[in-house]
Design a protein with these regions (language model features):
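Divalent metal-coordination and catalytic microenvironments
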Residues: 25, 37, 70, 90-93, ...
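C-terminal regulatory/interaction regions
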Residues: 256-321
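A short catalytic or substrate-binding loop motif that flags glycine-/basic-rich loops and adjacent residues
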Residues: 15-18, 146-148, 167-170
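Short, well-ordered beta-strand micro-motif
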Residues: 24-26, 155, 162, 175-177, ...
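Metallo-beta-lactamase
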Residues: 40-42, 134-140, 160-251
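Conserved beta-strand hairpin/beta-sheet module of binuclear metal-dependent hydrolase folds
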Residues: 1-56, 176-189
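Short Pro/Gly-enriched beta-strand edge/turn motifs at strand-loop
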Residues: 3-10, 131-137, 157-159
């Protein structure tokens, strides 16, 4: 789909998120393309991207720059293949490289501890780790040509693209803002219909990841946005309204958690199961529901509204009376 000089390309993803949208920006003289995110490392995704580029009168050789919104598999997976075969400059936040430098076994150990101590059944944790380990080991984060920081402008391109660091869903998450057209590419930071999850690795690294996410959402209210293009679901025409909806959603969820804890002590996994119920039936959705619940509980604990109690290696949460 094309809007002005922007193309949204839907690429298949071989797990529960189903798809990702990557974005192509045509240069004013139609000589080159900027790619925002690139899709998962699958033949289906690569062929779909290549065919789309050819259908609009370009070739993969016209790709000049790829900006990665964040280091989650469906957003960066094709980087290595593109980098090896085409002269594309790769840009990303330095935190993406920081994650790549962490010992992989340490990450697995931290994830295991996080979910076990928050009440998730061991069989579910093991199943997820097997899936996660396969994806990450087979698709390492490649070398980045240029790191970009909050407030930077992408160099050597005709578009005036400003980089906005927007942590929360991921520590390295970026939004990209075109000052001239007032278009923003929001990655997984602002999505229509669903609320972005607080990323798993960021849950481990941050004491209050939900608060960080809320603060970076608030920052986007300072930008005049005509339309935003997320990595999933539809473009958002009323981005400020959507941001406020997401902020209200998280406040409502915190109140729901507190009400759930009125008369009993529960684990994060138990609370997440009550919130999401049967719609979170797959292992991927179980992980998402648990991580989001942990993020809320960390925020509530920081605000002095809940306590955690460690019993037999598992954290139980109770409401502060």
């Amino acid at each position: 789909m094309k809007q002005n000089n922007i193309h949204r390309v839907r690429l298949p993803v071989p797990f529960f998120v189903n798809h990702v949208y990557v974005h192509l920006i045509e240069s004013p003289d139609n000589s080159s393309l900027i790619l925002i995110d690139c899709g998962p490392a699958t033949d289906d995704a690569f062929i779909t991207l290549k065919n789309y580029i050819q259908s609009i009168g370009y070739s993969m050789d016209n790709l000049e720059t790829c900006i990665v919104t964040h280091g989650h598999y469906e957003h960066y997976g094709l980087l290595e293949r593109i980098k090896q075969n085409y002269k594309v400059k790769i840009l990303a936040h330095p935190a993406m490289l920081n994650f790549a430098s962490i010992d992989f076994n340490e990450i697995l150990s931290l994830i295991y501890e996080l979910f076990i101590t928050n009440g998730m059944p061991k069989v579910s944790v093991d199943k997820f780790l097997n899936l996660y380990q396969g994806i990450i080991k087979e698709n390492p984060i490649p070398l980045i040509d240029e790191v970009i920081y909050n407030g930077d402008y992408v160099s050597n391109i005709p578009e005036k693209l400003q980089i906005i660091w927007a942590p929360g869903h991921a520590e390295d998450h970026l939004c990209i803002y075109n000052e001239n057209t007032k278009v923003m590419f929001t990655g997984d930071h602002v999505i229509s219909k669903v609320t972005p999850q607080i990323g798993l690795t960021y849950i481990i690294q941050s004491e209050n990841p939900l608060k960080v996410y809320q603060q970076s959402l608030q920052e986007l209210l300072n930008y005049d946005i005509e339309v935003s293009y997320p990595g999933h679901n539809n473009p958002i025409e009323n981005t400020h309204e959507r941001i406020i909806e997401i902020l209200k959603h998280h406040k409502s969820r915190e109140n729901w958690i507190l009400k759930t804890l009125d008369s009993k002590k529960l684990t994060a996994f138990e609370i997440g199961s009550k919130i999401f119920g049967e719609i979170r039936s797959t292992i991927g959705h179980s992980i998402i529901s648990c991580t989001e619940t942990i993020a809320h509980l960390k925020s509530l604990k920081a605000d002095g509204k809940v306590n955690d109690i460690l019993k037999d290696g598992i954290y139980f949460y109770e409401k502060v009376s």
